[in-house]
C-alpha cells in the first residue's frame, strides 16, 4: 500500500492501533512515526555571517566603477591631504662620485661593455718564481686585484649576453684565463710557505735551534 494512502487512512480513522497497521517491512514510516518523537532540525549553511551588515537589496551589486556605482558602506577617509611629488627643479642636484668603489666593475672609461681592444691589451700571467719574492701584503693586494678584474669581466659578459652584442666574448675569456693562472700561482706560493712554516715548527718542537749550529762553528 502506498505511504500517502496509509497516512490519509490513518487521519480519517483518527489513528490506528499497532495491531491494524501493516507489517513494518511494508510500511516502516508509520511505525517509526508512532514510536519516535519528532526531532527539531535546522537547515545547514556554509555561508559566513554578514558580520552585522544588513543587505542593501541593491540590483547593482557587483557592478564595476565604470557604471558609477558608489560604495555600499561608509568608508573612513583621512582628513589630511595626499602628498604631492616634488618638482625635479626643486630637488638638490647630486653629482656622482668619481672614485666610487662600484666603478671597479666597469672599464676605465665607465662604459657598460668593454671593447675587444681593451680586453686583448694585457700581459702574461705572474710566474711562481716572481711571486716567491713578494711579501705577504703584496700577494694579498695582487689577489684582490685579480678578483676585481674577474668581476669586471663577468659583469661585461653578463651585459654582453643581455644585449646580444655578438662580439668581445673570446677576448674577455682569454683575459680571464690569464688572471686565473696568476691566482693559481699565488695559491701555490702560499701553499709552499705554509708547508715551510709547518716544517720549521716541527723542527723547533724537536729541539732544533739555529743558534746552536752557529756556536759550534
UniProtKB/Swiss-Prot annotation:
Biological processes annotated in GO: mitochondrial translation
One cellular-component annotation, GO: mitochondrial large ribosomal subunit
Superkingdom to which the source organism belongs: Eukaryota
Subcellular location(s) per record: Mitochondrion
Pfam families reported for this sequence: MRP-L47
InterPro entries the record matches: MRP-L47_sf, Ribosomal_uL29_mit
GO molecular function: structural constituent of ribosome
Keywords linked to the UniProt accession: Mitochondrion, Ribonucleoprotein, Ribosomal protein, Transit peptide
Primary site of residence: mitochondrion
Oligomeric form and interacting partners: Component of the mitochondrial large ribosomal subunit. Mature mitochondrial ribosomes consist of a small (37S) and a large (54S) subunit. The 37S subunit contains at least 33 different proteins and 1 molecule of RNA (15S). The 54S subunit contains at least 45 different proteins and 1 molecule of RNA (21S).
Family: Belongs to the universal ribosomal protein uL29 family.
Protein name: Large ribosomal subunit protein uL29m
Gene: mrpl4
